[in-house]
């Protein structure tokens, strides 16, 4: 069901619920304000926007389709459409459509948006009285600035999260799980933000173009300030993305080094075991042959015979050690 709310620019005034049928009277009785059409039913909303307000049918079509971010100046009104963050999930976005006509800002949306909530707070404040002087262009500036500020808050949270991951990567005393997955997730989140903020920056830049005729001289300064904000968001995104990539490369390098160290330790253990086995193999063979067959070789049970056998085994062991040393398997690094 279509929900329509109106704010006529009064300080501290709440937005009033109304209906599409009553909007024409409200707009005649007041010179400026903000009309917010939420979850519009297509048939009645098309009727109101197209027939009552005489908005261009292409702009009206964009209210019920997936448009591209753009601005357009028609004969009797101006139109802008851009992405704003959806309140349901942090990085989900929905298109917000804005019409400017005779001092009125008319927004059409299909979802709850933090940017709209911030704009609602601003328009109710006592510092917002300039909307009566600058009409709908100033209202649109405040709306775009609210959306940009909302993205700035998201970036602040991402920056804090990135700092936390960097601290974990460079912590020498503890190994944290899922760091690589967290870094990939961070990179993905930054890309998703860029998909919305880059078109927003391009939209503001286009609004400022003199050939568009979208803004008046008295509001141009505000849009220039907004352009600086949207550009800084893009710059911060690039910096965070580079930081995440650098941290990921560092983590992969550290992981590779730890793996190499582990493999080196394993190789050292295997080398030591191989040396021991190599020495013990001939000694074991001697012990096996002479063990129960000592009488077959003409030897007796006296200590001299035992010492002779042990001497043979020791000589073989020493010979193996000398041979391994000469080959460089032990003693030389």
Give the predicted meaning of each segment.
Residues 136, 215, 299-300:
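Residue-level signature of the cytosolic catalytic core of signaling kinases
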Residues 114-138, 163-174:
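A short, charged helix-loop
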Residues 1-5, 27-30, 164, 210, ...:
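Cytosol-facing regions at membranes
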Residues 103, 147, 156, 160, ...:
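Membrane-associated alpha-helical segments
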Residues 276, 280-333:
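Alpha-helical transmembrane anchor segments
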Residues 1-131:
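Divalent-cation
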Residues 127-147, 151, 219-222, 226:
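Long, non-coiled-coil amphipathic alpha-helical linker/lever segments
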Residues 146, 150, 157, 322-327:
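Cytoplasmic juxtamembrane "membrane-exit" helices immediately C-terminal to transmembrane segments
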């Amino acid at each position: 069901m279509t929900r329509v709310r109106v704010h006529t620019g009064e300080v501290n005034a709440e937005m009033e619920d109304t209906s599409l049928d009553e909007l024409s009277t409200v707009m005649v009785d007041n010179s400026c304000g903000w009309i917010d059409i939420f979850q519009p039913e297509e048939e009645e909303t098309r009727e109101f926007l197209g027939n009552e307000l005489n908005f261009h049918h292409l702009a009206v079509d964009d209210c019920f389709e997936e448009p591209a971010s753009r601005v357009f100046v028609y004969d009797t009104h101006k139109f802008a459409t851009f992405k704003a963050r959806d309140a349901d999930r942090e990085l989900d976005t929905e298109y917000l459509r804005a019409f400017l006509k005779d001092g009125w800002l008319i927004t059409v949306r299909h979802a709850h948006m933090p940017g709209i909530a911030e704009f609602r707070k601003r328009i109710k404040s006592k510092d917002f009285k300039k909307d009566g002087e600058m009409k709908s262009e100033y209202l649109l500036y405040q709306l775009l600035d609210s959306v940009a500020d909302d993205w700035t808050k998201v970036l602040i949270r991402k920056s804090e999260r990135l700092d936390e991951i960097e601290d974990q990567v460079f912590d020498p005393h503890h190994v944290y799980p899922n760091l690589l997955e967290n870094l990939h997730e961070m990179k993905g989140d930054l890309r998703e933000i860029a998909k919305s903020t880059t078109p927003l920056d391009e939209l503001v830049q286009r609004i400022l173009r003199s050939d568009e005729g979208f803004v008046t001289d008295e509001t141009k300064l505000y849009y220039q300030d907004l352009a600086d904000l949207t550009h800084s968001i893009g710059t911060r995104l690039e910096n965070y993305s580079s930081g995440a990539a650098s941290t990921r490369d560092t983590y992969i390098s550290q992981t590779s080094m730890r793996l190499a160290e582990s493999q080196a330790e394993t190789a050292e253990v295997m080398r030591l075991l191989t040396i021991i086995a190599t020495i013990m193999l001939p000694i074991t063979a001697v012990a096996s042959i002479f063990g129960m067959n000592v009488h077959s070789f003409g030897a007796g049970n006296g200590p001299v015979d035992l010492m002779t056998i042990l001497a043979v085994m020791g000589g073989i062991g020493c010979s193996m050690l000398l041979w391994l040393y000469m080959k460089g398997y032990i003693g030389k690094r």
